[in-house]
Amino acid sequence: DCQVLVFCGVSFMGESACLLSPEKQVLMPDMEADCPMAHMVTKEEVDTFQDKYDDLAVVCYINSTAEIKSWSDVCVTSANAVDIVAKLPNKNILFIPDKNLGHYVAAQVPSKNVMVVDGYCPIHHKMQAQEIKDLMAEHPEAEVCVHPECNEAVVALADYIGSTSGIIKYATESPKKEFIIGTEMGVS
């Protein structure tokens, strides 16, 4: 019932709050808070794909700017991306801006021709498979839970792949007591 939202996060999240709650005032204490991935696609790139494929749906990960969302046919989260892409009538899908999440969706929905641009989340993308393997060797009983924004080599090592909320739910319900978590800090 509040009328003012104070959003302490990156700018695209504040923009999303404005889009989802246009009747509310959204305040962003730090307008410089930004996510590099949110800008890793251009209108020209999207136009090139749209010119090349008649049957194209542009699917945008929610972690992007309002402008990029406006170029898209549908906006998804990491929790619902696979289900939404699977239900689209289009054969050709341009997934923007996160190539790693796009590759994950492509692997889960092989009936679609999922194409990506070279965008990525710097936090998730910098995780390397060898780091995960080293942690697995140190903690052999631990389950590996990663976000689908991680690169494909890291995702291949995971016991569970899911959104942040999915990882938390999985770890809470698992009989295991030790986890290697491949996502942003604070999910532990």
Task: Spell out what each predicted region is.
Residues 1-188:
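Active-site loop-to-helix "anion-binding N-cap" substructures in soluble metabolic enzymes
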